[in-house]
């Protein structure tokens, strides 16, 4: 993200996504679980490459007072895309006889749309064109952590965002099981809770700009981390597993 021109780099990464999604479409159609697992790894790699670029490009195109709002929009868009994709994928794959074809077609179309969108990203000059890249992920990760520890503010911010993503990914993965086994809800209740989860993230991301007064305000980070932890613990103590023989309830009954 620092060594190369960012808009050009983003286009290459989005082009890579098209190739991966073409492979995913074939894996869905031919029901190749092994290929899907391999492509899932490649999508994780692609996301890892794209993440630093999409965040580091913001300061080069936004004013200082726009940075918090810009980060909020990116964060909201990222989580909404994950949740909508989770819901849409479940709906499409369940369509009898056509599910794999529909899922494969949609992921390829979305990848192409993403690449076309990247063509409109304005240029952003590299911050460190002479940077030497260390291809050893272990030593480079350790070096990066050591660098962040030199600045207490940056290090605590890294811990905060890591905690947020850890909890967010955990909730997203476990929410269907939690809904069925603990709340006794069916797939419609899962959809309802995922939608509520997405709305909460979206509203919180936008409120961050308002609460921070349009400036980078690190004082909000501890409150957010504490809120995530406290309400997570509350969710644990409020959970009462339903009886195994109980029938699942719908969204209307749940409300």
Q: Which residue ranges define each predicted feature?
A:
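Alpha-helical transmembrane-bundle signature of multi-pass membrane transport and export proteins
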Residues: 1-255
